[in-house]
Amino acid sequence: MKKIKTTPLAPQEFEVEQISENEANIMAYPFETGFAISLAHPLRRFLLSSSVGYAPIAIKIEGAKHEFDSVRGMLEDISDFILNLKETRFKLLGGATEAEINYNFTGPCDIKGSNLSNSEVEIVTPNTHLATLNEDSTLNFSIRIAQGIGYVASEDTYDELQDGYIALDAYFTPVRSATYKIENVLVEDNPNFERVILNIKTDGQITPLDAFRNSLEVMYAQLAVFNSEISVKAPATIERAEESPDLKKLTAHIDSLGLSARSFNCLDRSNIKLIGEIALMSTNDLKNVKNLGKKSYDEIVEKLQEFGYEVGGDLADDVVSALKKKIEAL
């Protein structure tokens, strides 16, 4: 006789299979029949449409009035150069959401994505070919880079540009692909449960796990409108997270780490108050804290490890959610 249920089984297992730096499989199980696809499909849509990334939105090239122009001594036409630029993936540093960056090149040279990296921007596709300059030729240009989601057509930003700029179609999403498959999984001799496997590939601006985490946050934010009118009981996992030893340690003040005055002041001036804020940061985020030198960086990493955590390390999702609520409440 089939067991009668009053509530569907909630999945308990979560796994991440890191395939490469920019590709991962994210698995969760066991789901009741039909539940896996009900969650996987909207998550995939959020991954592709709502992941925040950077893209060039406009370019100004010395000596060029439009995208069908050319530059003396450059092998590529302006239109080809722009196409190559769109294939280049940018990441602004220091938390900036928009920047205008100037570049000057003199031939002969082969310009690649790596040549555009500087103190303001990181190129996460360094091997992208941009242009080839002949001897005695020069290429001077400015790029406007912005942060956004999805796709924005050049017509939508044209009116905001200064004279001389060429508007570009902007592809912001850092997620190159997101696919899923559903498999059956055995639970207590019952094969009618499901496992969802999400395959996520990014361009290097963010990790697949961060992209997945961001898509969950967007989904939760979209559902929050219902909770504003209808009181929904928090899942037991969140309630347990509020009482977990991890959360208590992560919400301790940074002075609990016993840092030197210089390291402490760097964090404090950047408004980093809790140990958990450091644990949630990536290594690049921590390195980009204003006036934080290598010695201070190494000290913070070491002290955090002594506390039981890693910079950019994995924390349980329920702990991350509870921790972010604590940080937002500061």
From Swiss-Prot:
GO terms for cellular component: cytoplasm; DNA-directed RNA polymerase complex. It comes from the Bacteria. GO terms for molecular function: DNA binding; DNA-directed RNA polymerase activity; protein dimerization activity. Residues 1-230 are annotated as: Alpha N-terminal domain (alpha-NTD). Its EC number is 2.7.7.6. Pfam families: RNA_pol_A_bac, RNA_pol_A_CTD, RNA_pol_L. GO terms for biological process: DNA-templated transcription. InterPro entries: DNA-dir_RNA_pol_insert, DNA-dir_RNA_pol_RpoA/D/Rpb3, DNA-dir_RpoA, RBP11-like, RNAP_asu_C, RNApol_insert_sf. Homodimer. The RNAP catalytic core consists of 2 alpha, 1 beta, 1 beta' and 1 omega subunit. When a sigma factor is associated with the core the holoenzyme is formed, which can initiate transcription. DNA-dependent RNA polymerase catalyzes the transcription of DNA into RNA using the four ribonucleoside triphosphates as substrates. Belongs to the RNA polymerase alpha chain family. HAMAP family: RNApol_bact_RpoA (MF_00059). The N-terminal domain is essential for RNAP assembly and basal transcription, whereas the C-terminal domain is involved in interaction with transcriptional regulators and with upstream promoter elements. NCBIfam families: PRK05182.2-3, PRK05182.2-5, rpoA. This is DNA-directed RNA polymerase subunit alpha.
